Amino acid sequence: MLIVYFSSATDNTHRFVQKLDLPNVRIPLTRVEEPLKINEPYVLITPTYGGGVSMTGENSRPVPPQVIRFLNDEHNRSFIRAVVAGGNSNFGSDFGLAGEIISKKCKVPYVYRFELMGNEEDVSILRGGLTQNAQALGLEPQEPVTSR
């Protein structure tokens, strides 16, 4: 089971993913880095950007541009099996909005959302849910690995 994730320079999503103790690979932060190519089914974990704009009426771009670029590659998109989103519950209905958008566009389940860098309960729920439902999601079941 592979986790593909994006994390901004704050590393909140990175910290959460490392606590999952599952194989993972990070979508590059900058265009200078080599683009990521995925060749197996994966769960995408992404933060949500621009939280709270629905309350102000501004235009929202909740999916990070790096994630959009990654998913615009049809090959990468063909292997996505589920999406998880991070965010901030202070932003009301925008909390985890990136997950909703990706789920609809890629026609995959939006399986979980967590706040900021998640807590131990989030880690336990998501890890357990992914492990128990790996086959149903089209993922290869796998035992946790030691974090890198």
From Swiss-Prot:
One of its GO terms (molecular function) is FMN binding. InterPro entries: Flavoprotein-like_sf, RNR_Ib_NrdI_bac, RNR_NrdI. Gene3D superfamilies: 3.40.50.360. Pfam families: Flavodoxin_NdrI (PF07972). GO terms for biological process: protein modification process. Coiled coil: none annotated. It comes from the Bacteria. PANTHER family: PROTEIN NRDI (PTHR37297:SF1). Belongs to the NrdI family. Probably involved in ribonucleotide reductase function. This is Protein NrdI. The lineage of its organism: Bacteria, Bacillati, Actinomycetota, Actinomycetes, Mycobacteriales.
